[in-house]
From Swiss-Prot:
Signal peptide: none annotated. It comes from Molluscum contagiosum virus subtype 1 (MOCV). One of its GO terms (biological process) is symbiont-mediated suppression of host NF-kappaB cascade. The keyword Lyase does not apply. The keyword Lipid biosynthesis does not apply. This is Protein MC005. Interacts with host IKBKG; this interaction prevents NF-kappa-B activation. One of its GO terms (cellular component) is host cell cytoplasm. It is found in: Host cytoplasm. Keywords: Host cytoplasm, Host-virus interaction, Inhibition of host NF-kappa-B by virus. Plays a role in the inhibition of the host NF-kappa-B pathway by preventing ubiquitin binding-dependent regulation of host IKBKB activation by IKBKG/NEMO. The gene is MC005L. Its main location: host cell.
Length: 85
């Protein structure tokens, strides 16, 4: 899901996030000193960071909501960014 959002958005920021995430995941796979549990933990943290970063981009946030099957907030539908809490 976190890979779909930056690919759908396609802005420079989301493309950089996607590139960095894929590079980090590739490096993680090649690390032979880490246990499988440590690799899984690191991968989860990378994904959480990617989701956080994508949510700070309007297009990325909307793509992430679509990927999750969630409706956009009223403020986002009106093009005003995220609704205030």
């Amino acid at each position: 899901m976190c890979l779909v959002a930056p690919m759908q958005c396609g802005c420079a920021s989301c493309v950089r996030i996607l590139d960095a995430l894929l590079s980090a995941m590739e490096a993680l796979v090649q690390m032979r000193l880490l246990s499988e549990e440590e690799k899984t933990s690191c991968a989860s943290q990378f994904l959480e960071l990617a989701i956080f970063a994508v949510e700070n981009c309007r297009g990325g946030r909307q793509a992430l909501l679509q990927a999750r099957g969630e409706p956009a907030s009223l403020g986002e539908v009106a093009g005003k960014g995220p609704a205030a809490d």
